[in-house]
């Protein structure tokens, strides 16, 4: 076990889906995985392991924000040997081409967080990127499934309520959406030489004001979940 995950060695698969919401983790386990067993309830950050079309997969809730996801990603990699991490989360859309319920494949993640500065020091602006093979597989699967999706840069923010951010400039620079976790996931994947991808569903739009309900965010977005599991299924055992 680790500080925040109460699971014995071997209880967690080498591929893990990472929803922020514990109830979304439970929804995925109950509706998509076969023979799912819960391995973690610490802080109600539920974790489950089961199989998807014969491939062993885990799903671990991470909570909200860079500090929280950093805890779980560090422990999954260092204490449980996880090699592939796929975030399945929500994001706020920006730009007129990005619609509510669209899927965003985060190729890279800009950030206003100090996590890059704290890691590299002043003057070096590291660019956290997705694993290309996972990204390519997700795009290919989305094409064959007729899922409406976008590939590009997202913004990982430290604050959910942030009126000071220049949204129009972000739109002008083709930032697709904003969320709160991807920079940490990609940074830690680079640090530990593992594989990571963020697959996001646009749950609300920052310009139009359109949004989904809390219930839909918790127990829906099946395109994103199915896409993530389809990618997970293709990952070779490591």
Curated annotation (Swiss-Prot):
The keyword Heme does not apply. Phosphate binds at residues 20, 24, 43, 87-90. Its EC number is 2.4.2.1. Pfam families: PNP_UDP_1 (PF01048). GO terms for molecular function: purine-nucleoside phosphorylase activity. Catalyzes the reversible phosphorolytic breakdown of the N-glycosidic bond in the beta-(deoxy)ribonucleoside molecules, with the formation of the corresponding free purine bases and pentose-1-phosphate. This is Purine nucleoside phosphorylase DeoD-type. It comes from Lacticaseibacillus paracasei (strain ATCC 334 / BCRC 17002 / CCUG 31169 / CIP 107868 / KCTC 3260 / NRRL B-441) (Lactobacillus paracasei). The gene is deoD.
């Amino acid at each position: 076990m680790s500080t925040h995950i109460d699971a014995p060695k071997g209880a967690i698969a080498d591929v893990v889906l990472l929803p922020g919401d514990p109830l979304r983790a439970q929804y995925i386990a109950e509706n998509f995985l076969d023979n799912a067993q819960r391995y973690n309830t610490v802080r109600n950050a539920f974790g489950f392991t089961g199989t998807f079309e014969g491939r062993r997969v885990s799903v671990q809730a991470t909570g909200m924000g860079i500090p929280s996801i950093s805890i779980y990603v560090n422990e999954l990699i260092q204490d449980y040997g996880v090699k592939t991490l796929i975030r399945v989360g929500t994001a706020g859309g920006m730009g007129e081409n990005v619609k509510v319920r669209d899927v965003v494949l985060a190729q890279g993640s800009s950030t206003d967080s100090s996590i890059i500065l704290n890691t590299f020091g002043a003057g070096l602006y590291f660019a956290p990127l997705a694993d290309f093979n996972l990204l390519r597989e997700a795009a290919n699967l989305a094409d064959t499934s007729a899922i409406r999706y976008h590939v590009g840069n997202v913004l990982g923010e430290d604050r959910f309520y942030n009126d000071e951010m220049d949204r129009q400039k972000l739109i002008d620079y083709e930032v697709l959406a904003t969320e709160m976790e991807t920079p940490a996931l990609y940074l830690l994947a680079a640090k530990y030489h593992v594989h990571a991808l963020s697959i996001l569903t646009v749950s609300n739009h920052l310009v139009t004001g359109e949004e989904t309900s809390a219930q839909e965010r918790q127990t829906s977005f099946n395109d994103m979940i199915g896409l993530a599991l389809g990618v997970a299924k293709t990952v070779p055992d490591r």
